[in-house]
From Swiss-Prot:
Keywords on record: ATP-binding, Ligase, Nucleotide-binding, Purine biosynthesis
CDD domains per the UniProt record, alphabetical: SAICAR_synt_Sc
Signal peptide coordinates: none
Family, per entry: Belongs to the SAICAR synthetase family.
Source organism superkingdom: Bacteria
A Pfam family recorded for this sequence: SAICAR_synt
Name of the molecule in the record: Putative phosphoribosylaminoimidazole-succinocarboxamide synthase 2
Keyword Ligase in annotation: yes
InterPro entries in the record: SAICAR_synt/ADE2_N (IPR028923), SAICAR_synthetase_CS (IPR018236)
Amino acid sequence: MTLSAPNALAVVDLPCLPNHYRGKVRDNYDLPDGRRVIVASDRLSAFDRNLCAVPGKGQVLTETARFWFDATADICPNHVVAYPDPNVLIGKRLKMLPVELVVRGYLAGTTSTSILTLYNKGERQMYGVTLPDGLKANQRLPQAILTPTSKAADGDHDAPLSPDEVLAQGLVTPAQWEQLSAYALALFARGQAMAAERGLILADTKYEFGLDETGAIVLADEIHTPDSSRFWKAATYEARFEAGQRPESFDKDFVRAWVAERCDPYNDSIPEIPAELIAQASAVYIEAFEAITGQTFAAPDASEPVMARVKRNLDAYLAG
């Protein structure tokens, strides 16, 4: 499926709503009654910058998260109040906990905090876990492990933490950590089981939690989306692993690689990304959505700009 690039949602413009905060991908508006309006844009970010807008990306993220929030509501309460638009989630405003719960089922990753990066440097003890010698890249771990990280301020990098460090720094209480750990591992187990039914491997993911007005722990942000998770195609995993090849995935890194080959992306201006590359990224997101959820992606009406539709649907929801 090819979507029209001019209809991509790059800038969210809702001046009538209060308390605006723009993240890398999502724009948030805090309403006086405790609800938060979360609009997923089509922005594709890397190198701490926005590279381009990928048509359909925000809708894929919102609707994939919706699929998983619905599928895991029996495990853990979540922040969802309503979905007035394919790109919009209305959530409960929470007091966010300052730790991200990353769960990993495989020795994988490319970031400085990933267990594969640390393992290849010779480290065997990380995040309070000891890994055996002799593991290979992308190998399944004996069991899923929690690898928490601190939530870095803008411009800083997340720092790896052991459970003991989480508690020593007072990021959460011991009782909260016990509940967070149980929730994260149960959510991951459900995700892996459902992904397997779809011919996929959920290799790793991250969860964010907050506290509601009663102090209860609530799942926030997103869950098992193509941005927060690593999904591989199960049918080719074993053969590719034995051959020392990377697992087949819904890889979007080709946009990042194209930019990195042409400039210093941290300091130079970003060159205009070709339309065919953006269309390819859009197709990957849509393929991922359909593979993960088993649903058919409902392409937006090209005759109405996405921002106009978002505003129309939000106006109707908030007036109701």
